[in-house]
């Protein structure tokens, strides 16, 4: 099973990276590097998915991503 992750530097705290899963908003984390943030977020994702399974709730489908181009002003 795979989920799309967003990993980006926190604009309010330079040097802090955030990782989150749009399909599972409860699963997110941060770290000093993109890799560290993603590793922590993956742990959170596994915990959330285990909880959903244990409580008989359906697992959310992943999101669909698209890139949108615009003319820079």
Predicted regions and their residues:
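Short aromatic-glycine-(Arg/Gly/Cys) micro-motifs in beta-strand/loop hairpins
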Residues: 9-24
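A short, exposed loop/beta-hairpin motif centered on an aromatic-Gly-Thr core
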Residues: 25-36
């Amino acid at each position: 099973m795979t989920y799309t992750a967003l990993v980006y530097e926190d604009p309010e705290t330079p040097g802090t990276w955030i990782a989150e899963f749009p399909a599972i908003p409860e699963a997110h984390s941060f770290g000093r590097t993109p890799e560290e943030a993603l590793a922590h977020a993956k742990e959170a994702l596994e915990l959330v998915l285990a909880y959903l399974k244990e409580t008989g709730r359906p697992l959310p489908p992943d999101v669909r991503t698209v890139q949108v181009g615009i003319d820079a002003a």
